[in-house]
């Protein structure tokens, strides 16, 4: 309309508006902004994770910026290598994409902007290391970062070291990897990509390569029986899938009341790892300690999952798809010319359902396939009820309707779970994937990892499924042999010992306590009172309790020995608000309950049973 230049994100459209998006003035302004960004950016592109994929690099090339007219002002390099997600603030251009992905898409808010002006940074909560925050390691911040300021820990060297040390290296490949790896090698719709991956890994030094889709069949089979048992007993419903480690950590942190509802069946990665180390090692006569199991996944959170104490080293190394690309390219081989090889038996056969685990709806669909093999199903109907959320209604012959929900994206998940809690939505079984479109959109997938690319990967995976002769996990005879030889029956004691686990609520932030009213007196005289200020307790009144405790300490003589602290989680979210008095947790705390317990502690310390009870 001939007005000044305005930002598109702040200008509301109106009827008849005329907009010019590319004029000489706008071109020069964009060019100047790029030059300023380059002047404050780490220009060591050759060793950057994003070299060749960097948006800043691409825009500089598109605008013909071969030199920069501004002097480089280096930012303070703040590198966090503490966890699976590696942070390098020297590469950050403060675009905010990672912050928005974490806050708006995933509703985790593990990172945000801090400080002002040139000192502005993107940092984790309380400037903690990422591993000590509520981060669920979904990797969507990495997927959306345009410059490599956020990257994934590289574990490729561990693989080469294992091969060099003569270890019996076994690989296993997730379904979603075969749908995305071809993007890096100029291949389209190559249904032989899985076989090419097997061939290259064997050339590198892998002894065996298995298909995680096999264990997806196993997990679907076991999980379907677990669901039918819960349905019959009408307990722990709705049953939530537990294949996605980002979702599991999200549930442990934000919805601890639903942790018992998580399926106890391990994820396909961890189930196959346990089977290989426990049974297959004996079959091939190799000490399990000499086996190095390398899992190749589309997901950053799978690295976190493999390191969880519950799984006790079932999987040794996890490589993302991007790391596998580095391995393949470093060999110098033309993957298009590599002859494909089949996955090794006995864990190389899978059904269409097992392959479908790589995309949203796949786990639920596989469970439904098994249910249909076990009980009479009259009709199955699926419809979208909101963005990222599908409802499947399974009508059984006896007239019962089983409702299943498949939801992706933790922001959508939060809405669904909140509606389940309020009763606005009903379901019997819920499939959850932390990343949009499921595993094909995982944080470890190649760049670009946008909506269009994810949709194409889903299409490739469907084409790959279509050539599989087996439809249901029940048809996988190698899986049935595994039950006959080792596991016995679904949900047997042996099955529970091997492919089941348990989860627990966890702290969102690993932070030291904050002194509110510290006391200079000896520990023997103190009563330590720590008030949880985590989200669950905070929303249920813990801050008000803290204020009352401070007033109590100032006004009542007996309370002078209360040393008051703030803490972030007592891992008892289901009974919030929580207060820790010495070593005793007071759940559903009120100021009256706290006074009663504190006076009891004082009597025990002083041996004075005559402490006045009038203060109660």
What residue ranges belong to the model's regions?
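Iron-sulfur-associated redox domains of electron-transfer enzymes in respiratory
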Residues: 1-30, 38, 153-616
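Structural motif corresponding to the C-terminal cap of alpha-helices
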Residues: 106, 145, 280-284
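Fe-S ferredoxin-like electron-transfer domains
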Residues: 2-137, 143, 150-169, 584-616
């Amino acid at each position: 309309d001939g007005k000044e230049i305005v930002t598109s994100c702040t200008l509301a459209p109106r009827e008849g508006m005329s907009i010019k998006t590319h004029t000489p003035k706008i071109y020069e302004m964009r060019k100047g902004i790029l030059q300023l960004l380059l002047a404050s950016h780490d220009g060591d592109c050759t060793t950057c994770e994003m070299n060749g994929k960097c948006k800043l690099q691409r825009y500089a090339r598109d605008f013909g910026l071969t030199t920069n007219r501004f002097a480089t002002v280096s930012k303070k390099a703040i590198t966090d290598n503490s966890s699976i997600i590696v942070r390098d603030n020297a590469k950050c251009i403060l675009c905010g994409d990672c912050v928005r992905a974490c806050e708006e898409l995933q509703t985790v808010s593990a990172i945000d902007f801090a400080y002002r002006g040139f000192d502005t940074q993107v940092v984790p909560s309380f400037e903690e290391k990422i591993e000590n925050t509520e981060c669920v390691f979904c990797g969507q911040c990495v997927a959306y970062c345009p410059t490599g300021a956020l990257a994934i820990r590289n574990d490729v060297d561990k693989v080469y070291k294992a091969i060099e040390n003569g270890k019996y290296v076994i690989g296993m490949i997730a379904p979603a990897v075969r749908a995305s790896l071809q993007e890096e090698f100029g291949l389209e719709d190559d249904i032989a990509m899985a076989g090419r991956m097997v061939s290259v890994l064997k050339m590198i030094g892998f002894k065996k390569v298995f298909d995680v889709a096999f264990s997806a069949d196993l997990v679907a089979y076991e999980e379907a029986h677990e669901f039918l048992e819960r349905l019959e007993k009408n307990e722990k419903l709705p049953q939530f899938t537990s294949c996605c480690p980002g979702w599991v950590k999200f549930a442990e942190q934000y919805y601890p009341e639903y942790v018992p509802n998580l399926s106890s069946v391990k994820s396909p990665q961890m189930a196959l790892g346990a089977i290989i180390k426990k049974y297959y090692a004996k079959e091939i006569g190799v000490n399990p300690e000499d086996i190095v199991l390398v899992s190749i996944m589309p997901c950053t959170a799978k690295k976190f999952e493999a390191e969880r104490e519950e799984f006790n080293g079932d999987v040794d190394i996890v490589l993302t798809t991007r790391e596998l690309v580095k391995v393949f390219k470093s060999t110098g081989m033309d993957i298009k010319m590599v002859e494909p090889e089949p996955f090794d038996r006995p864990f190389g056969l899978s059904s269409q359902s097992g392959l479908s685990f790589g995309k949203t709806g796949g786990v639920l669909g596989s469970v439904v396939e098994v249910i249909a093999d076990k009980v009479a199903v009259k009709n199955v109907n699926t419809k979208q009820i909101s963005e990222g959320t599908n409802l499947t209604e399974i009508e059984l012959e006896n007239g019962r309707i089983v409702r299943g929900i498949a939801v992706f994206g933790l922001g959508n998940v939060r809405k669904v779970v909140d509606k389940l809690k309020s009763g606005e939505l009903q379901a019997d079984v819920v499939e959850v994937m932390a990343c949009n479109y499921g595993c094909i959109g995982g944080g470890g997938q190649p760049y670009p990892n946008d909506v269009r690319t994810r949709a194409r990967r889903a299409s490739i995976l469907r084409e790959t499924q279509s050539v599989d002769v087996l439809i249901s996990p029940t048809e996988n005879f190698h899986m049935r042999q595994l039950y006959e030889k080792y596991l016995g029956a679904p949900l047997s004691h042996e099955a529970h010992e091997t492919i089941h686990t348990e989860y627990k609520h966890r702290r969102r932030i690993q932070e030291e306590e904050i002194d509110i009213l510290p006391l200079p007196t000896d520990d023997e005289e103190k009563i330590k009172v720590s008030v949880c200020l985590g989200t669950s307790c905070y929303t249920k009144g813990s801050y008000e309790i803290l204020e009352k405790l401070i007033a109590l300490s100032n006004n009542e003589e007996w309370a002078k020995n209360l040393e008051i602290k703030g803490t972030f989680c007592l891992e008892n979210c289901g009974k919030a608000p929580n207060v820790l008095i010495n070593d005793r947790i007071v759940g559903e705390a009120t100021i009256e309950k706290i006074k009663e317990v504190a006076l009891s502690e004082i009597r025990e310390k002083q041996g004075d049973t005559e402490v006045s009870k009038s203060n109660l």
